């Protein structure tokens, strides 16, 4: 059995996309991890899966798996690629679709130039909603001081359908993203782990951002991370409310807009890379594992 797939990216955040509306495949953590291997598999940051909806008021079910095989609630760059993919595969002819995710409903709107606007929903900031459960909370206004391997780190928390910690830095180029990101991502205060964003405010409508993603590591771009960072910046008064904020990541820029009490709106590009097929049993056998069928 051969399964068709498409390789896509949103600002360098790369995805393997599989249509399970017209195809059938049993996805296991072992298979996903093998497919994610950039030397022996396809290679990707996340696997995006298109499935039939489980409720009548949406068009599709949108599932996301990290390269370590774990299923996650949300991926903003992936959502844009998802919208373009279902159009290209003629699974939908709508320019505006609703999809269900583990964290709720997303509305995706495409244009004719490869850009997609995503209604990311309202950000949540309460610790229980992240979830964020430090043994002792040291808080100054909206900032928390967290002990990270013996060093106090000031951070902000936000949930954009998935958990985020945001750290304001003077220069993202000198920020120790690998060491600090890894330590915070798996910190006991974040029971479901966390994505860690390092934000440099350039002016009221421009930030630079690096994100250490949960279960992946640092990526070229992170859509939900950009939304969490901009929402945090607006909440703290560093950025302009209700205006388009340019979030500049290594892979390119996203436009984020938010006013408190409303949804965060994210707009950005997508790109198709190539299409191919793979044999699930062949992938498993190559690794010395029992075939799926």
Swiss-Prot record:
The record marks 274 as: Important for dimerization. It catalyses: (2S,6S)-2,6-diaminopimelate = meso-2,6-diaminopimelate. Gene3D superfamilies: Diaminopimelate Epimerase, Chain A, domain 1. It is found in: Cytoplasm. The record marks 164, 213 as: Could be important to modulate the pK values of the two catalytic cysteine residues. Its main location: cytoplasm. Belongs to the diaminopimelate epimerase family. This is Diaminopimelate epimerase.
